[in-house]
Amino acid sequence: MRAHRTQLCGAALGHLGDLLLGDPRRGHPVAAFGRAAAAAERVLWRDHRGAGALHTALCVAGAVTAVTALSRTARTLAGAGGATLVDAAVTWTVLGGTGLRQEALAVARALHADDVEGARRLLPNLCGRDPQALDADGVARAVVESVAENTSDAVVGALVWGAAAGAPGMAAFRAVNTLDAMVGHRSPRHLRFGWAAARLDDAAGWPGARLTAVLAALAGPSPRGALRAWRADAGSHPSPNAGPVEAAFAGALGVRLGGTLSYGGRTEHRPVLNSRGRAVRREDIAAAVRLSRRVGALALLVTSAAGALRAGRRAERGAR
C-alpha cells in the first residue's frame, strides 16, 4: 500500500504540474528520447520487420530501464519522498493535455479572428494534415479530431499505464507512442520497419482509448449520442483506437467527424463518424477542449481508484 500511495501522490502532482505548467519548455525528455530513437534507427534500419522489432524493443527497454533506475536511486537516497518526486516528474513529462489544449485554442483564436492562413500555419502543431487544402471549417474539424485522439494518447492512456505499472509503465507507453509517430506509418521507408511500433502502439493504446470513449460519453453534453456514434461508427475507422475516441467525441458534441482528408500529399476518404451530427464549426474547438479537460480529470480519478483497489487486494492476499 505504501508504494501505491507514493505512485498515487506522484500521479496527482504530475497531473497538477501539467495543468499549471504545461510541457517542459526546454530539454523535454520525450524530445531527447526521439533523438536517441532516430540515432538508433540510422544504425539499425533495414527494410525488414525484424529490424524494426529490434529497434522498438531496444528503445522501449531503454526508456523503462532509465526510469526504473532513476526511481530506485531516488528511493535509496531520499526514501518514499524521492520516489514520489520521480513519479511526479515522469507523469508531468509524459502527460500532454495542457499543451494539446493550448495548441487547439490558438487555432481557434485565429479562426475567430478570420485569420484562416494563420490557423493553417498553426495546425501542424497538432496533426500531420496538409493544411493548405482546408477551409476554416476543415481546419476546425481537424483540430477537434486531434483533440479527441490525443486526449487518449497524451492523457488517458498514460494514466492507465501509470496505474498498471507506475512510472516505468508511463515511460513505456510514451516511448511506444513516440515510436509510432516516428516510424509507424506507411511510407516506403517505414512500411516494414515501422510495423512492430505500429502494432505495439495499437495494443498499448487499446485500454486507454476505450476508457477515453466511456469518459467522453459520461462527461459530454450528449451521453446517448456518444454511445450511439461509438457503437455505430467506430469499427469503420481505420484505427482501432482512434475510431472509438473520435466517434464518442463526435456523438457527445453533436458533430460529424471523418470524411476526406490529406496527409503528405496523399488523399484519404475516411468514413463519417456520427452522421446525424452537423458539420464542425470553429466554436466546437472550445467545446472539444472543455470535454478533453473533463475526461482527463475523470481519468485521473478512475485510474487512481483502480490502483487503490488493486493494491488493497494485494495487501489482503499478503495478510492471509
Annotate each language-model stretch with its function.
Residues 1-320:
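Short amphipathic, positively biased membrane-proximal segments
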